[in-house]
């Protein structure tokens, strides 16, 4: 046995997973034989923690399918999906629902707000559903960041489209999720409201260390990301760091042939 004077070694500090989410050798196949369609065709991709990743590609390239499978909203036909260190491919539906509720935030093109609840109640609804206490200090910080402090008592019908999407972003942020998946979050908004939402998502990464993965067809929206992934025919075919509008347009033009 070591003597009394032997040095005491503390346990190593926990390390952050290399990827906030990861898809490994992922296939999503519809139909069979002559009618088989491979929406995802052996794709492997990881999403870094505390970074903003955009996913782009032509219509039918598999970008929304990739996001849905990575977020546990749909299942791969073959392959693995990890959220942090959890292989969600092995979870049953109840376990998967719980993981999504606890670890993942969502922002969709459709705002998906409950019309009978106020903006504030919509923001905290996922926490209420999970029986989790609202951190009022964090809630105040989030609603201030997205510019909703004076709109919390309004119903969705009393808010503009841009304001409703701000509620959706705040709802995702207030849960402190491990990762936020955003599917065309500015698709139904005017240019100014779109810029506001993208700024809030960017600020969530820079100020709060949030991880954001966004599907978009808009080259301007993609410039808010740290990294852009390009898909074609269900495969990852290119990526771009520190994107600009011109560099994104050039890559998309090359994919279009």
Language-model-derived ranges and their functions:
Residues 2, 223-226, 255:
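Compact Cys/His-rich metal-coordination microdomains
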Residues 235-257:
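Conserved beta-strand-loop-alpha-helix hinge in the C-terminal portion
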Residues 1-15:
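Pre-NBD coupling/linker segments of ABC/ABC-like ATPases
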Residues 18-225, 230-231, 236:
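ABC family nucleotide-binding domain
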